[in-house]
Amino acid sequence: MLRSRTVHAGVESPFAWWRLATAVVLGAVGSVGMWSVPVVLPAVQAEFGVARGDASLPFTLAMMGFAFGGVAMGRLSDRLGIVAPVVCGELALSVGYIGAGFAPNLFSFALLHIVIGIGASATFGPLIADTSQWFSRRRGIAVAIVACGNYLGGAIWPPILHHFIAGEGWRATHIGVGVFCGLATLPFLLALRRRAPMHDTESMGAWSAGVQRGLGFSPNALQAVLCLAGLSCCVAMAMPQVHIVAYCGDLGYGVARGAEMLSLMLGFGIVSRIASGFVADRIGGVATLLLSSALQGVALFLYLLFDGLASLYVISALFGLFQGGIVPMYAIIVREYFPPQEAGTRLGLVLMATLFGMALGGWMSGVIFDLTGSYQAAFANGLMWNLVNVLIALWLLMRPGRRVAHA
C-alpha cells in the first residue's frame, strides 16, 4: 500500500500541472522544425532556382525525420526518461539549423531537414506520452493542452521567421534558430527529471481486458486502422499548412499575408485542441475524431470556392478551428483502447503515420501545382483524402463493440 501511494502521489498534482506547462513551452520551441519550411519555401526556391515541388522536398524529409524520430525518441524516453530525448532533440535542432544555414545547394539543405525533423520529434510525441502518465480523470484535456505546444509554436514562429528572413536573409535566420534551440531549453530540463508514475498491475489488467472489448478489433488490427486514418487526414491537412504562404504569393497578396494566415490558422488550432480535449472527455476520442475530420473537410471545400484576401483570412481561421483537434484524438483513442504499457509505442506508430501523411501531402500538393499551374486541384486532392478519414472514423464509431474508456 505504501508503495502504491508513493507511485501515484504525483498524478494530477500541482507538480503534474507544472510539468504540463513546461512540456508546452518545450513543444513550442521544438516545433520550429515543422513550421520553418512553409515560410522559407519561396526564398529557397528563388535562390536555388528549382520548381515548387522540389522546393517542398525539405518539408517532406523533415516530416520523415519527425516520423521515424518520434518512434525512436519514444523508446528512448521509455528506457531513460523524458530528459534524454529532449536533450538529444534540441542538439539535433541546433546542428540541423546551423548546417542548413551553410547549405550550398537544395540537396544538402533538404538532407539536413531529416536531422531537424528528428530533433523536433522529441518535443511532441514523447512529451504527450509522458504527460498522459501524470493524469487520469483529466487526461483528455491534459493531452490536448500539451499538444497545443506544437500549434503555439506554429502561431509564433512564422511571423518571427518572416521578419528575420526579410531583414537578414534565410541563411542567417537558420543559424540564429539553431543557436536559440541549443540554449533556450536548458532551464526547463530540471522540471522533467522526475520519472512519470507507473501504473499498478490491477490497472494494467483492466486495460488489457478493455482492449479485447474495444471496437471488436485485435490490437494490431486497430493499430493498422488508426494509422490509415492518420495518414489520410494529414495528407489533407498538409495542403493549406505547407502551401498557404506560397499560395498567397501566387495570388499577388504577398508572402507576408500568407505567413499571417498560417499563424492565424495555427493560433485557432490551439483553441480547437483545447476544446477537443473537453469534448473527448465527454463523448470519447472516436466521436471527436469524426466531428473534427468532417469540419476539416468543410474548410477545405471553402478554399475551393473562395480566393479573395479577406475570404482566405476567414477560411484559414476556420481551418485552424476545425482541424486542430484531430491529431490529439489519436492519442486519446490510444489511451482509451490500448493498455498503458503499450501506449508509447502505439502512439508513436500512429503519429508516424500522421507525419507520413503531412510529408506526402506537402510534396503531392507541390507536384500537383507544378502539373496544373494552380492549387485548385491540390485542394480537391486534399478533400478526397479527408473523406477517407471521415469514412474510417464513422465506421469505427458504428462498430458494435465500441466503448468509451476512462482510466
Model-identified regions with their sequence ranges:
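Extracytoplasmic gate region of multi-pass secondary transporters
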Residues: 37-41, 221-278
